[in-house]
């Protein structure tokens, strides 16, 4: 029951983002008029890939939070298997053993939500940070995402 809610929420997040992003991208071009310079196709493709990485990480974190909040650990484990590389899964498990907390959230409690924020791209890897919302406070984890394999390859504390 809860996993259907999580899947619907993830699908809704992707659908809304897919509908809004083209409008946001069109705004500056429309404001600049017909003399606007167009980015080369490679730049547009790189931008699209980066947006895909941000969407995927954001979708993962919010679906994972929903699953953990309702103690649906089977769904949480499925999400880990789908969105994390096997090396990242092993690193998360090691972090959990050492810190006695959730290795995805880097916390013992469950936040209210999450927002993935792009930082940079280098050599096929997108570097992001994820802001975890805790009422009026936030905490941050750093995330590495492989554009090649389309999985999270690392989660760490910002230090």
Short names for language-model regions:
Residues 1-7, 12, 21-48:
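C-terminal region of N-terminal signal peptides and the immediate post-cleavage residues
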Residues 17-21, 53-56:
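Hydrophobic alpha-helical membrane segments, chiefly transmembrane helices and signal peptide h-regions
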Residues 32, 136-159:
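Short beta-strand edge/turn micro-motifs at domain boundaries
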């Amino acid at each position: 029951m809860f996993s259907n809610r999580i899947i619907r929420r993830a699908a809704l997040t992707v659908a809304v983002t897919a509908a809004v992003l083209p409008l946001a991208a069109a705004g500056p071009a429309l404001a600049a008029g017909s003399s606007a310079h167009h980015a080369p196709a490679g730049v547009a493709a790189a931008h699209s890939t980066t947006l895909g990485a941000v969407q995927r990480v954001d979708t993962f974190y919010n679906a994972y939070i929903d699953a953990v909040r309702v103690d649906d650990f089977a769904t949480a484990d499925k999400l880990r298997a789908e969105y994390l590389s096997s090396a990242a899964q092993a690193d998360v498990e090691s972090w959990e053993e050492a810190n006695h907390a959730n290795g995805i959230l880097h916390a013992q409690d469950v936040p209210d939500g999450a927002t993935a924020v792009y930082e940079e791209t280098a050599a096929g890897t997108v570097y992001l940070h994820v802001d975890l919302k805790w009422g009026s406070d936030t905490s941050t984890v750093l995330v590495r995402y492989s554009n090649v394999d389309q999985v999270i390859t690392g989660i760490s504390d910002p230090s």
